[in-house]
């Protein structure tokens, strides 16, 4: 049930995100949430998530290295309004439709619904954390997001996959080593924790930029 992970260039990711955030707000958002008002916000998230999930990396050391969890965590913490959760969820849903087709799977797999539910849980965690300035809170939220996602999705794999014994031992196997013959589940968890930490701090940095610090923001304001 595990999907091959993706990785994307950090410079491209952070640059594009700061461009969209420069459109979405015109003042430092450190003290309040951001309300994304531009349709480009939805388009940007579609590009970000879709791009990150379509770049395969065959080396198992990087499986599950993705910004997706960080996007939902930061969206919950710093964005408000209906777009704060519908935009990233639509991006995941649309990219999943194409990924499932590429892997020869049905367009609407039960696993797809479970992952979307997991993302909403992480979004709720971000709402609970809020736009904190304390990096320790953000780090805790990032680690908690990765662990929650791992437990929810691996537990569903344990239920749905006949390769697992339906016992406590089988559940622990799903959480730790996974299905025999495949990359161990703990590798996915490790990379999920590292990537969520990395991209959460990257997104937090991008959001904290003042308009004058964002490329071309001064030119846009002057015009």
Region locations from a protein language model:
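Positively charged N-terminal leader segments that act as targeting/secretion signals
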Residues: 2-11
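Short, charged juxtamembrane terminal tails flanking transmembrane helices
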Residues: 22-31, 212-223
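Hydrophobic transmembrane alpha-helices
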Residues: 22-86
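Central hydrophobic cores of alpha-helical transmembrane segments
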Residues: 45, 85-95, 138-146
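Structural signal for the C-terminal ends of transmembrane alpha-helices
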Residues: 51, 74-82, 121-133, 205-211
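Interfacial aromatic-anchored transmembrane helix boundaries in multi-pass membrane proteins
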Residues: 52-64, 90-128
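Membrane-embedded alpha-helical hairpins and interfacial helices in multi-pass inner-membrane proteins
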Residues: 133-212, 216
């Amino acid at each position: 049930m595990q999907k091959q992970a993706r990785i994307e260039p950090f410079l491209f990711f952070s640059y594009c995100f700061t461009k969209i955030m420069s459109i979405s707000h015109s003042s430092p958002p450190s003290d309040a949430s951001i309300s994304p008002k531009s349709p480009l916000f939805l388009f940007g998230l579609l590009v970000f998530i879709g791009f990150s999930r379509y770049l395969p990396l065959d080396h198992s050391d990087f499986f599950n290295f993705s910004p997706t969890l960080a996007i939902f965590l930061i969206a919950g913490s710093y964005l408000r309004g209906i777009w704060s959760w519908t935009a990233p969820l639509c991006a995941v849903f649309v990219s999943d439709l194409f990924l499932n087709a590429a892997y020869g799977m049905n367009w609407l797999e039960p696993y797809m619904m479970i992952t979307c539910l997991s993302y909403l849980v992480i979004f709720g965690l971000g709402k609970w954390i809020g736009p904190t300035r304390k990096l320790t809170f953000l780090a805790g939220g990032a680690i908690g997001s990765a662990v929650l996602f791992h437990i929810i999705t691996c537990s569903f794999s344990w239920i749905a996959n006949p390769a697992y014994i339906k016992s406590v031992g089988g559940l622990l196997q799903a959480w730790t080593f996974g299905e025999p013959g495949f990359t161990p589940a703990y590798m996915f968890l490790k990379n999920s924790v590292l990537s969520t930490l990395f991209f959460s701090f990257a997104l937090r940095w991008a959001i904290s930029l003042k308009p004058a610090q964002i490329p071309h923001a001064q030119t846009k304001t002057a015009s």
